[in-house]
Amino acid sequence: MTDQRGSLAGTLSSNGILRVAGSASGTLVGLYLVLLQASRIGSAGAGTAGTLGASAYAAELLFSIPLGVLADAWQPRWVMVAGALLGAVAVQLFGLTHNSAIFFLSRVLEGISVAAVTPPLLAWLADRTEGDLRARARVMSFFELSLLAGLAMGGVAATQLWSHFHGTAFSLVAVGYLLAALLLALFAGGGGTAPGHNALAGLRLALRDDHVRRLAPVWLCVNAVTGLWLGPTLAFLITSPSAPHRSQFFNGLYAADPTQFGWVLLGYALLFATGVTGWSMVLARVGVHRAMLISLATMLPVCLGFYLVNHAGGASSGYRWTIGIATALLILVETGFTPAALSWLAGSLHGGVGKGSAMGIYSVLLSVGAIGGSLMAGWLGNLFRFDGLLLGTVLLAVAGLLLMARIPQDAPADSGETIR
C-alpha cells in the first residue's frame, strides 16, 4: 500500500510539473510574440498567438487516441516518458528562432507531447485503482488538482523567468519537462499490456456509448471556453503595449510589468481549484446533470462581471472591488462542470479493456473544443480585444445550455460511485 501511494504521489507530481511547463510555455509564447512585435520582427499579433495555440491543440487531437491505443499495447510509463522528452525538445525550439515555421513546429510537437502523456496517465491511474471506487475518485480529483496547480504556477513561472532570463526562459522550462520525464520513469511502473485487439475493442465500445455521444457537444463548448482563456491570446492582449481600444480596462493592463499577469493567473487557478474542491463534496447531492446546468448558466453572470469591470472607466476602486468579489464567488460556482462531466464520462467508460483508448476520448474532446476556442480568441481578440473573449464565452455558454436538453437527467450507472 505504501509503495502504491508513493508511486501515485510521484506520478501525480510529475503531472503537476508537466502542467507547469505546458502553461509556462503557452505564456512565454505570448510574451515572446509581444517582444517580436515591439522589435518589428515579423508580423506577430493576436491572430498569430491564437493560431499557434490552435496548432498545439490540433496535434493533441490527432494523436490522443493513437497514443492511447499504444499505451494499451505497450507499457504506459514509456509512452509518457517519451512524451515528456518530446515536450522538452519542443519548448526549446521556440526560443531559438524568429522563424514562424519553427514556431508552428514547436507548438505541434508540444501538442503531441501532451497527447503522449494525458490518455496513458489517466489509463494508468484507472488501472492502479481498479476495484476501489473511492480510491479512484480521490486519485482522479488529485489529477485535476495537480493540473490546476500546474496551470496556476505555470503563468507565474513564465513571467518571472521571462523577467529575469528573457529567451533563456524557454530552456529552463525544458528542464521542467526533463524532470517530469525522470519522475515518470521512476514512479509510473506497473500496468500490464493488453493485446491490440482489446485496445481497439475498448475504443469501439466507448465511441458507441450513447452517454458519451450526448455529452460530447456540450463538453466541446466548455472546452472551447478553456481554449479562449488559456491560450496565448489572453497573455498577448493583457501585456501588449500597442493594444487599441483603450476604453477597455484590461487591454494592455500589464504592458509595463508583464510579471503581474502571472500572479493573476495564479490567483484565478487557485480560485478555480477551490471551486473544484468544494464541488467534490456536494456533487453527489446536487446531481451530475444539475451541476452541469448550474455551471454553464453561471458563466453568463461571470462574463457580465468582467464586462462591468472592463468598462468601469473612472469608477471608484470600491466599485471595481465589489464587482470583482461578486464575480469571484460566481467563478467558484461555474467550476462544477469539469468534475460533473468527468463523473458522467467515468460512468460510461468500459473498464475491461482499452483504458488508454477510452481515455483518449477525454483528450480529443478537450482538443477539439480548445482548437475552436483558441481560433475564436484570435479572431474576436483582433476585433474587440478583451471584450471579444467575453463575447465568445457568452456564445459558447448559451450553445452549451441549449445542447444540455439532449442529455437525460439520469446519470450513467457508475457516475454516482465515482463522486462519493
Each predicted region: which residue ranges?
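Central cavity-lining transmembrane alpha-helices of secondary-active solute carriers
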Residues: 51-68, 266-278
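Juxtamembrane intracellular "pre-TM" segments in multi-pass secondary transporters
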Residues: 1-5, 188-218, 420
